[in-house]
Amino acid sequence: MIQLYGLRKDYRVGDHDLPVLKGITLNIEAGEYVALMGSSGSGKTTLMNLLGSLDHPTDGDYHLAGIDVSSLTPLELAAFRSQHIGFVFQNFNLLPRATALDNVMLPTIYASDGRSRRECIEDATKLLESVGLGGRLDHMPNQLSGGERQRIAIARALMNRPKLLLADEPTGNLDTVTEQEILALFRQLNQEHGITLVVVTHDAEVAHEADRVVRMKDGLVAEDVRQRASTVDRSRLANSRAEPLREPASAWSLPATWNAIVVAVLALRRNALRTVLTMLGVIIGVASVISTMELSAGASTAIEETVASMGASMLTISPGKASSTSGRQRPIQIIPDDVVAVAEQCSAVKVAAPLVYSQVQLVRQNRRWSPNLALGTTSQYLAARNWDQLELGTPFTQEQVLDAAKVCILGKTVAHELFDSEYPIGEEIRVNGVPLRVVGVLTEKGGDVIGNDQDDIIIGPWTTFKLRVNSSTGATAQFSTFADQMPPMQLASTRRSTQREEIHQIYVEAESPDHVELARQQITQVLSRRHNVEPAGAYRINDITEVSKVVGQVVGGVSALGLVIAGVSLMVGGVGIMNIMLVSVTERTREIGLRMAVGANRSAILRQFLIEATVLCVVGGFIGIFAGHMWSVLVGRVIGWPTAMSIWAPIVAVTVAATVGIVFGYYPARTASRLNPIDALRYE
């Protein structure tokens, strides 16, 4: 079964090659029970490692059941170990966080023999029962005695039905009674199952149990003694014939990947505090991404809602200073006749209304309130702002505008501050000392682009605010670009002409958002012609889309800055993950060697550690999503900034976190996958 021809193994020590095996030629028949003996440094352990394909010979040939092991590639060697070799180690090499059943099932992860998980569980259970541990399936290694742990190691070695069982000092850490039990188990496996057994030992009693003893000295076979003829039934050796190496199981198959995820979670739980601290950078980075995206999405939504509430087709015309056709500089005034001209002569204009602003204090009984905005206008303005359908009452009429009637309409906020839950219609309030009757309450609008309350407003006829409210205090408008107020006028009980009164702005609604630019051009031409001025600088015409663009650019800039900071945090988190994964590779070097010994190839090891890094980042990502959402809600409430949840935010965050795990976990995973199995098993 085993043929060794001139097998050599040299180790490089400094500038020199140190020969350990100096040309071993040895044949071992199928079903033989062989003991390898020799003093320390004789080469017996090195020979066992070569037999188990854990190490590569420097020279010579090694055939097992007709397979030229010396010529196999690393991938084929992994499949060879999985299919043909079983290992029993002196120190057991059990996974500390896995149950007895899971430890025995470890080789099946890397096997490609077609067994289902249920079949693997059944086989592992039978093996544990056969070694006397049927009642210990769910026990952890630290809950078992040394003999029980070695029995688990033997059951694990038999899990893939190997042709060759290699045992390195299997009784070295056991008491005398347990040693005899293990030796009896070896004899049973050899005689009843026909397994070829090679045991490395210093103990003469252990060697006495073998059919054949091979003594080594100075890297050569010094003595080869057959103690007794093999008693194995030759009919049981039929299955020991060579089988073609099966295609290795895919490292990324669903069962293998799921097992890797489970192992990753167990490994991360092993050092919970270190895991949390490692994830902190990812958590902060993802939380920054989520909060930034939600706050910016909320701001964008607020901008859109404000544009919709104020009108995407809205323009405001304010006076400026310009040169007349004669070349003289003079201030420009806007009068109600200009409003009429704009409405009648500009085909792109749907609605035009005058605007008069005031700074006022409102008083009702013992309640006082200063609204954000006190505005005089006409009913056309209310219609353009979708305020013609009031929550309570009715809009003021054109007749009331002409009469400068003492009426007003309150926003929801003002109505609440002055009347609380009382019915306000028909009640009287004082506006800068002028008594006005409440005729309506506006429907709720909410905050504007920058968070100002659009419902903190009082609206009345522009004539009322111009001739009564503003004149009552001698106040001037709050806008420096407006002309000085005209002297207060004696109000008459009859209607009077107000078409030459100065107003502060003109509110215009274009026929559609597409007509805004045309409306701007037409308005400039009409007003410049009416006032005999050059168009440049005479009027400032603004539309809400310009304001929205500016605010949007500011929000975009702040969001970009936040995302840059989040990216830096993710980079720091990624470096931390790389560091901790390198530490994990070092701590689990023996585990890596064990997995390779039972059939794991480089791709499987790479997958294992890559998944661990990814799991670390994805878990941190989910925590970051929750933390980021809570942070954005908190910030929004504290500073009054709107927030909006986005389905893309968590998707982007998890994707970025997983990418960080893959990118920064690749180097540690690659480092683990390139370890030499024998070096990994020897690592202390």
UniProtKB/Swiss-Prot annotation:
Binding site residues for ATP: 38-45
Keywords: Antibiotic resistance, ATP-binding, Cell inner membrane, Cell membrane, Membrane, Nucleotide-binding, Translocase, Transmembrane, Transmembrane helix, Transport
Main location: membrane
InterPro entries in alphabetical order: AAA+_ATPase, ABC3_permease_C, ABC_transporter-like_ATP-bd, ABC_transporter-like_CS, MacB-like_ATP-bd, MacB_PCD, Macrolide_Exporter_MacB, P-loop_NTPase
Domain of life according to the entry: Bacteria
Topology versus the membrane: Multi-pass membrane protein
Residue ranges constituting the ABC transporter domain according to the UniProt record: 2-243
Enzyme Commission (EC) number: 7.6.2.-
Compartments reported by the entry: Cell inner membrane
Family: Belongs to the ABC transporter superfamily. Macrolide exporter (TC 3.A.1.122) family.
Subunit details: Homodimer.
Protein name in UniProt: Macrolide export ATP-binding/permease protein MacB
Record organism: Rhodopirellula baltica (strain DSM 10527 / NCIMB 13988 / SH1)
